[in-house]
Amino acid sequence: MTESVFETRKLSDIYDEVREVYLSDNRPWILGFSGGKDSTCMVQLVWNAISDLPENQRQKKIYIISSDTLVESPKIVEQITDTLSKMEKAAKEQNLPISTNLVRPEIKDSFWVCLLGLGYPAPSNNFRWCTDRLKIRNADRFIT
């Protein structure tokens, strides 16, 4: 039998830690959401932890952002947009300080402008220009 290198923790302890960190300062939180299992789990942990706080302690704003790279399948974009909309509605109904935002690259940073217009090579493991231009810059623009 293999022992885990990860500390075994109760879910209630994780919720307590999230609440403690949330209440420790007044800086807003920005959570990246892709719709995958990791970001979905993170949003759910934060959501559940903050929901248990009294309403007068839910003062810090939480922004959930997702990147529309403008090259995703329309079904993927529809799924993310629908999920963000449902989160936004539920946050309002539950009086949570959570808002959702879909960020997109500027035209000059879009995949097709870079690939066809500027002659960038197709992204590869050695040259991943698309991650910065299609996701990171948009999140940075939202933050600032």
PLM-predicted stretches and their roles:
Residues 1-144:
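ATP-dependent adenylation/nucleotidyltransferase module used to activate substrates
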